[in-house]
């Protein structure tokens, strides 16, 4: 409910900032039910001493419905003059990131759900801003190699049993937009071992 109270935002951040010896960054949404306080909330965070502010372009009530409110994000970007502003929400492509920087006026972008099944997106965006070149999307084979590496690292971290169960929930993101994905997704959802998944995606260590 603090999204309805800029003074509360200032108070909370100021108290946290006062006991830290490291930079404090904050992420918030455009508001609770509407974005009318987005700029005021952002300025309260800036005044309280945050080192950077990230804002997701939806209200708390919207959750992930609708579209990111780029107009409100632009207003916030224009209002903040002392700290970097990081735009978040609906950044799925290099073009989306480019728009947030060039049109919204953000200093940086933050990517969440779009990175699930496509961690390569970070590389594409970094490469574009460093060179001006847009790298091609990954092939299915390359996506499966990354998915396999993801699974192997999960196994190293959590053990095979837990990792495979978690990977069953991640696989649909890697398969999104792939021809015949439903059948493969269904098969992976039944797998219980690394060997079974290796067989399904035809990769070996």
Which residues does each PLM region occupy?
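Active-site mouth loops of central-metabolism enzymes
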Residues: 26-38
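Glycine-rich, proline-tolerant flexible connector loops at the mouths of alpha/beta enzymes
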Residues: 1-3, 55-65
């Amino acid at each position: 409910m603090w999204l309805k109270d800029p003074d509360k935002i200032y108070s909370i951040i100021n108290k946290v900032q006062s006991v830290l010896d490291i930079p404090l960054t904050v992420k918030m949404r455009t508001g609770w039910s509407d974005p009318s306080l987005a700029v005021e909330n952002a300025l309260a965070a800036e005044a309280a001493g945050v080192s950077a502010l990230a804002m997701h372009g939806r209200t708390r009530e919207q959750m992930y419905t609708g579209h990111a409110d780029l107009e409100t994000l632009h207003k916030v970007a224009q209002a903040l003059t002392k700290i970097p502003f990081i735009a978040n929400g609906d950044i799925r492509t290099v073009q989306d990131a480019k728009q947030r920087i060039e049109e919204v006026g953000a200093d940086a972008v933050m990517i969440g759900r779009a990175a699930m099944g496509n961690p390569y997106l970070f590389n594409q965006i970094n490469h574009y801003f460093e060179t001006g070149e847009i790298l091609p999307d990954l092939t299915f084979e390359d996506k499966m190699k990354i998915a396999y590496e993801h699974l192997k690292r999960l196994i190293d971290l959590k053990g095979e049993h837990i990792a495979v169960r978690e990977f069953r929930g991640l696989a649909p993101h890697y398969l999104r937009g792939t021809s015949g994905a439903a059948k493969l997704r269904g098969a992976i959802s039944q797998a219980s071992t690394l060997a079974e998944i290796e067989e399904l995606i035809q990769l070996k260590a």
